Regions:
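Non-catalytic interaction-recognition regions
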Residues: 1-285
Length: 285
């Protein structure tokens, strides 16, 4: 759309009005040094083809003009030097570039049979995201990418992603969720209702208290994730929560002959199901 309505070239005109555009060697340059940056940058090549900086600049202007009050840009590490030019250009036109949050992601290495798959865009040898999703499924791909912070290199192990064992963090979490759901389903089959008046003081073992305390941290985890723009906080939290549940499950029966304790542990299990569902929903899984 920015090309069809010529907004990218209108952006050049706006920069010209600010004396931030000049021609050299047949190319159109952004006078970035006039805006306080270290080097001027080409916006339109001598061939007439725009560099990627120009549509990025026009796109941000368009977002500001449409009233967006916060923008989150996700760049690869190879664009580390590009985004300051984009922010500088829109700032020079009077837009508040502080409303743009830039996240720089490190690269991803795809591993198969323990070895990295060699990729080269020049040789058209690469794995697309679509191919990755076809190989292991969308939930696994999303979770593996979310697990790592933006500053951490990701080794995407295809064998691990397809492994149906506790070594696979997605399987580990899904297994906990399945166990919880099966307990709730079994209680329903036995006509045991969730009793909100259950005596929760009966939940006093270390594994139960650890699980309760961890669940209580969920709102803080969500807020911290929002504030830091680091969703790996949620995946780490959910993995730890699943770990606490597996420890609880290994030592305790939820449904037993002790009706009072059963009622209390069903409340605990139902609460855990809600937290797991909410966490997975936030992650889009």
């Amino acid at each position: 759309t920015l090309y069809k309505n010529r907004e990218i070239f209108n952006f050049i005109d706006k920069l010209k009005e600010k004396n931030l555009i000049y021609e050299k060697d047949g190319a159109t340059w952004f006078a970035a040094t006039n805006a306080g940056l270290k080097a001027d940058k080409v916006l339109i090549k001598s061939t007439g083809e725009p560099t990627y900086r120009l549509p990025d600049m026009a796109y941000h202007k368009d977002k500001f003009d449409r009233g967006y009050d916060i923008m989150i840009d996700v760049f690869g590490a190879d664009h580390m030097d590009a985004y300051p030019d984009v922010l500088s250009a829109v700032s020079e036109l009077g837009y508040d570039s502080s409303k743009v949050n830039v996240l720089i992601h490190q690269f991803v290495t795809i591993l198969k049979d323990g070895s990295p798959i060699k990729m080269s865009t020049r040789k058209a040898n690469f794995v697309t995201l679509e191919e990755l999703i076809d190989e292991v499924g969308p939930d696994v791909v999303r979770y593996f990418f979310i697990m790592r912070g933006t500053n951490t290199h990701l080794n995407f192990d295809l064998d691990l992603a397809k492994n149906q064992s506790d070594e696979n963090p997605v399987f580990y979490l899904q297994y906990a969720h399945a166990r919880v759901s099966n307990i709730i389903k079994r209680a329903s089959e036995l006509k045991i209702n969730i009793d909100k008046a259950a005596d929760l003081s009966l939940l006093n073992t270390d594994v139960e208290l650890n699980l309760i305390n961890k669940m209580n941290l969920f709102p803080d985890c969500i807020k911290r994730t929002h504030d830091t723009k680091e969703p790996q906080n949620i995946s780490t939290y959910l993995h730890d929560l699943a770990m606490y549940f597996h420890k609880f499950y290994a030592k305790n029966k939820v449904i037993s002959d002790d009706k009072s304790l059963t009622a209390s542990r069903l409340i605990l299990t139902k609460a855990l199901q809600i937290v797991l569902n909410n966490g997975l929903t936030v992650l889009g899984i």
